[in-house]
C-alpha cells in the first residue's frame, strides 16, 4: 500500500470521526472519539491492508483493466502496420534516480520531526531545573493514586500551570507559585494529571505526532492532531468528575478557569492543565 493510499484512507476515517464528533460530542463518552482517532492513526502509520469487499479499491477496476477484467483486443485493419504504443512518461527524478516528490516528502518529514524533537528537548532541558515537591500532603495524594509506574512530583518556576510528561517514568510538574498542597484545588489538579498518566496520553500524543510528521501534506491529519489532543482533555475531565463526584463538578470547573497554561513553555508531548477550548469542557 502506497503512502498516498494510506493518507487517503486515513483522511476518510478522520472525516467520518470528525462528523460523528460534531453530532454527538456531548452525548457519547469521550473515549469513543479517541478510539476513532486511534483507528485513523493506525491506518495512517501501518502499511497493511485487510482485504474487504467494502474497500474503495475493491470496487474500482484494477489499473490497466477494462470493466470486463481484461484488455480489449486491438483492431488491426488488413494491410495496415501495427502502431507501437506510446512510451509512458517517466516520473521526474533527480540525478541520483530518486523521484523529486519523494525528496520533497522526506524533507517535510525531517523538518516537522526536527521541530517536534527540538521543542521536546528544549522543554526537557528546562524541566531539569525543577526541584522535588516534598510536601507530605502531596506525597499522600500521589500514593493514593494507585499507579504501578513510579511517578515523580516536582516544582518548577518555568511554568504557569501543572503538566505531565514522560511515558515509562512520568513526571507531574507543578508551578513553584502554586500553593495549597492540602486544599481541594490541589486534589483536582493531581487527579487530573494522574488521569493523563493512567490513560497513557503521552504515548498517544507521540503516535499523533508521528502521524502528523509522516503525513504533513494532508491537512486532515493536522485536524485530527488538534481534535484528538482536545478530546484527551475532555476524556480526562470526564474521568476526574466521575472519580471525585459529579456534585463537585462546579469546583472542578472553577479550577479549570483559574489555570491558564503558559504556551511558550509547553511542548507537543506534554499534557497541561489548561483552559484551552473551555467551551467544550465541563
Residue ranges and their predicted role:
Residues 187-201, 208, 236-237:
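Active-site recognition of the HExxH zinc-binding catalytic motif
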Residues 44, 49, 172, 207-223, ...:
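Hydrophobic, aromatic-rich membrane-embedded alpha-helical segments
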Residues 161-182:
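Active-site scaffold of zinc-dependent metalloenzymes
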Residues 115, 119-125, 167-172, 218-221:
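Acyl/amide activation-and-transfer machinery of modular secondary-metabolite enzymes
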Residues 1-27, 31-117, 124, 128-133, ...:
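Hydrophobic membrane-embedded segments
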Residues 48, 131-135, 145-147, 198-199, ...:
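Short helix/loop segments within enzyme catalytic domains
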Residues 152-156:
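General small-molecule cofactor/ligand-binding pocket signal
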Amino acid at each position: 500500500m502506497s503512502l498516498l493510499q494510506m493518507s487517503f484512507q486515513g483522511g476518510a476515517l478522520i472525516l467520518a470521526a470528525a462528523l460523528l464528533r460534531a453530532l454527538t460530542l456531548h452525548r457519547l463518552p469521550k473515549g469513543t472519539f479517541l478510539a476513532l482517532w486511534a483507528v485513523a492513526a493506525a491506518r495512517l502509520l501501518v502499511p497493511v491492508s485487510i482485504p474487504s469487499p467494502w474497500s474503495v479499491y475493491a470496487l474500482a477496476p484494477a489499473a490497466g483493466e477494462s470493466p470486463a477484467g481484461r484488455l480489449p483486443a486491438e483492431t488491426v485493419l488488413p494491410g495496415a502496420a501495427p502502431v507501437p504504443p506510446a512510451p509512458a512518461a517517466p516520473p521526474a527524478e533527480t540525478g541520483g534516480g530518486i523521484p523529486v516528490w519523494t525528496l520533497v516528502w522526506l524533507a517535510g518529514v525531517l523538518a516537522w520531526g526536527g521541530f517536534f524533537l527540538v521543542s521536546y528537548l528544549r522543554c526537557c532541558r528546562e524541566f531539569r531545573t525543577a526541584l522535588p515537591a516534598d510536601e507530605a500532603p502531596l506525597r499522600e495524594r500521589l500514593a493514593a493514586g494507585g499507579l504501578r509506574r513510579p511517578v515523580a512530583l516536582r516544582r518548577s518556576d518555568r511554568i504557569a500551570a501543572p503538566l505531565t510528561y514522560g511515558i515509562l517514568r512520568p513526571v507531574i510538574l507543578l508551578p513553584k507559585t502554586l500553593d495549597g498542597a492540602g486544599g481541594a484545588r490541589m486534589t483536582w489538579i493531581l487527579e487530573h494529571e494522574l488521569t493523563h498518566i493512567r490513560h497513557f496520553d503521552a504515548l498517544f500524543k507521540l503516535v499523533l505526532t508521528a502521524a502528523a510528521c509522516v503525513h504533513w501534506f494532508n491537512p486532515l491529519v493536522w485536524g485530527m492532531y488538534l481534535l484528538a489532543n482536545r478530546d484527551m482533555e475532555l476524556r480526562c475531565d470526564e474521568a476526574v468528575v466521575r472519580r471525585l463526584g459529579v456534585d463537585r463538578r462546579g469546583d472542578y470547573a472553577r479550577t479549570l478557569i483559574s489555570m491558564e497554561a503558559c504556551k511558550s513553555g509547553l511542548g507537543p508531548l506534554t499534557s497541561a492543565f489548561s483552559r484551552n477550548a473551555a467551551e467544550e469542557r465541563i
